[in-house]
């Protein structure tokens, strides 16, 4: 039953991506991106719905051409979550998705083209209340910056970002957020640290092209964890070569670890050893699969023996300590004994019961507040 995060977040300007606040005092938003063919409207809508079910706050969709722009409009009509259109090179695509109700434009002013084209995009965004994300990436730095620095560096990423920020400043447009991504953890972290000191706009965090499910999760947890622990970051996206739903799960796990967001079960489990009185690994795998639908923030401890079990169980909403028999704790107090027979079924029932009680209590607090 862990408390609020001790992290003091960086002060930033609040913007709105659809109905989701970003920056200021808003919760850190979890974002993902579709990896379907945008022209396949049904497949893209289905994937977005899976992301929504996983708890995503904002979804980015690649819009590489005008056909995709028209498909984007159809997708937008069929989903409720805010959508970001990822636009490069052709400013007319940005203008079209603005007409079709996009919630945010992800552009790089440097590759949109002439000043008049950037102005046209900014004017369309301003007229419709659409924010912009300036997305700087180590893999696509401007040629003059590559020549100046010799290779991507934190300073190069920040100079690129500030160049685009100044571009929007000249057009008197402040409704934007910024990202400075790199696949190298140290480069990305230092770039965000430098940028955070120089602008007030929200920062979208990510380690780009982080890798597959395991390696990408580790890189993202290390990099984003460092920044978030320093109070830097207003939205996050975990870039994984995997099912985008995994990006959302990992994102929430990172935020839960830092007590920055609470959603669903926060499991505390031992790695198990020969002292375990039940199969901890099997029990955890079954519980995680069965309880994915629970949204109520709940701490659940699953400890295989009495060495650390009672201590961890007393700190959880629901705790299981291995023994002969096993002992269940509810809100830190011993509640009942369980044998290994039907252990997972009984534990699931108790967790769901506690989740329902907590949801009711939380709702009552909101009403009284």
From Swiss-Prot:
Q: Which organism is it from?
A: Pseudomonas putida (strain ATCC 700007 / DSM 6899 / JCM 31910 / BCRC 17059 / LMG 24140 / F1)
Q: What is this protein called?
A: 4-hydroxy-3-methylbut-2-en-1-yl diphosphate synthase (flavodoxin)
Cross-referenced SUPFAM superfamilies, in alphabetical order? Inosine monophosphate dehydrogenase (IMPDH) (SSF51412), Nitrite and sulphite reductase 4Fe-4S domain-like (SSF56014)
- To which protein family does this belong? Belongs to the IspG family.
Q: Which UniProt keywords apply?
A: 4Fe-4S, Iron, Iron-sulfur, Isoprene biosynthesis, Metal-binding, Oxidoreductase
- Enzyme kind, highest EC tier: oxidoreductase
> Do the record's keywords include Magnesium?
no
Q: What does this protein do?
A: Converts 2C-methyl-D-erythritol 2,4-cyclodiphosphate (ME-2,4cPP) into 1-hydroxy-2-methyl-2-(E)-butenyl 4-diphosphate.
Q: Where does [4Fe-4S] cluster bind?
A: 270, 273, 305, 312
User: What GO terms are given for molecular function?
Assistant: 4 iron, 4 sulfur cluster binding; 4-hydroxy-3-methylbut-2-en-1-yl diphosphate synthase activity (ferredoxin); 4-hydroxy-3-methylbut-2-enyl-diphosphate synthase activity (flavodoxin); iron ion binding
Q: What is its EC number?
A: 1.17.7.3
Please give the PANTHER family that the UniProt record associates with this protein.
Answer: 4-HYDROXY-3-METHYLBUT-2-EN-1-YL DIPHOSPHATE SYNTHASE, 4-HYDROXY-3-METHYLBUT-2-EN-1-YL DIPHOSPHATE SYNTHASE (FERREDOXIN), CHLOROPLASTIC
Binding note for cofactor:
Binds 1 [4Fe-4S] cluster.
Q: In which pathway does it act?
A: Isoprenoid biosynthesis; isopentenyl diphosphate biosynthesis via DXP pathway; isopentenyl diphosphate from 1-deoxy-D-xylulose 5-phosphate: step 5/6
Q: Which Gene3D superfamilies match?
A: Dihydropteroate synthase-like (3.20.20.20), Sulfite Reductase Hemoprotein, domain 1 (3.30.413.10)
Name the reaction it catalyses.
(2E)-4-hydroxy-3-methylbut-2-enyl diphosphate + oxidized [flavodoxin] + H2O + 2 H(+) = 2-C-methyl-D-erythritol 2,4-cyclic diphosphate + reduced [flavodoxin]
Question: Biological process (GO) annotations?
Answer: isopentenyl diphosphate biosynthetic process, methylerythritol 4-phosphate pathway; terpenoid biosynthetic process
Cofactor(s) the protein requires to work: [4Fe-4S] cluster
